[in-house]
Structures are given as C-alpha cells and as structure tokens.
C-alpha cells in the first residue's frame, strides 16, 4: 500500500475524551466509546483491488483546516497490523513533521494498540501489541479509564467489531471517485445492521463526511 494511503483518514482525529463522571455515577465503571474514521469511494469501496487508498487523499484548504483542527483531539488509536506498520513507517519521520506537523505530533503522542498474532513488539512511541481475542480485549479496554478509542483504516477489525456490535460511532468520508472494484469496509458482515445518520458535512473538494450511530 502507498504511504499516502491513510494520510487523509489519520488527519482527522475526531474522537475526544467522553468519559462518564460526576458524583452521581461514582459507583459506575467508566465507559470509553469506540469510533471509526474511514473513507469510501462513491461506489462504496474501502480499497481498490491492490489495497491502495491513496485515492482518498485530496488536498483542499477547507479540508486541511478541518484536519488540523481535529488533530488536537485525544484518543487511543486502534489498528490492525497492516495499518499499524504503514503508519509507523511514516508518522515518526521528519517528512511527516514538516508536511503535517500538528497531525504528526498527535499521532506520535497518542496511545496506540495494534491487534496482531504475529507482531511481538511495537516500536512506535506509545504503542502496545494486543494478541488477545479482539472482541474480548476491546470490551476490556472500553471498561477501563482513559481516552475514547478510535480505529483508523484496519478494515478487517472494523468488520469484526461491527459484527460484534462493539463500535459506537462511525465517521465515513465519501470521496467523489468511482473505483469500479475493490474491498468494502464491512466485508463479511451479516445480519444487515442499520445505522442512524446524526450529522453530515460537505467540503469544497467534494468529500462528504457522515456521522453514524448503530440503531
């Protein structure tokens, strides 16, 4: 996959701290939300047939401002191995610091969990490897104190956690391009889950962001 694959997606760190609190809920365990931010083509594909997503990276002043504003948000990032390795090759570099300084600082600073059965260590700053069952570990993470959880890329994880009903919110960017073929974001999901559209925003580059919650 190209290094630019998730530059657009990783720029929008829109998950913010949203923990429950207050004296009236002191005995209730904190709950962290799990969100997804990803891009799809106009014909509904998450990647093309070669697993490339560089088509999702479209420069535009309005879009860039949106990315920079949201890059200061707090989240714990969640990845699959392929997405993690690609991110880890780019965001700690001088090129990332020069071209997208705010996003690079956020990506390097935030806590990161990568789910993998093959990785033994994760060298990117503030990263850890989780080899436990995906759904079990996500349930555990959501029950612990900390920033909300945000998945970037990682289509297989998104599909599995959607099937398990563990994702609370989806931010999906529809990019005005037709790929013709590829892989969908929800590959293999069964049961026809439905979602509620809670917000939309259109940008001058043609991107439309939809905020969805599970019905």
Regions found by a protein language model. Give the residues of each.
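C-terminal segment of classical bacterial N-terminal signal peptides
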Residues: 17-23
């Amino acid at each position: 996959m190209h290094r630019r694959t998730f530059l657009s997606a990783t720029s929008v760190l829109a998950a913010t701290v949203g923990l429950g609190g207050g004296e009236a809920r002191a005995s209730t365990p904190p709950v962290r939300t799990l969100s997804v931010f990803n891009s799809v083509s106009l014909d509904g594909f998450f990647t093309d047939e070669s697993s490339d997503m560089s088509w999702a990276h479209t420069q535009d002043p309005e879009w860039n401002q949106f990315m920079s504003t949201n890059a200061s948000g707090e989240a714990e990032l969640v990845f699959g191995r392929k997405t993690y390795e690609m991110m880890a090759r780019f965001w700690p570099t001088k090129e990332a610091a020069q071209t997208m300084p705010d996003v690079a600082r956020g990506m390097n600073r935030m806590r990161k969990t990568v789910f993998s059965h093959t990785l033994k260590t994760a060298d990117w700053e503030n990263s850890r490897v989780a080899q436990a069952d995906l759904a079990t570990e996500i349930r555990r993470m959501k029950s612990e104190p900390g920033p909300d959880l945000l998945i970037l890329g990682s289509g297989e994880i998104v599909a599995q956690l959607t099937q398990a009903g563990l994702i609370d919110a989806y931010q999906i960017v529809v990019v005005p391009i037709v790929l013709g073929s590829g892989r969908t974001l929800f590959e293999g999901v069964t049961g026809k889950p439905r979602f509620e559209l809670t917000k939309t925003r259109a940008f001058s580059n043609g991107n439309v962001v939809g905020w969805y919650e599970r019905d």
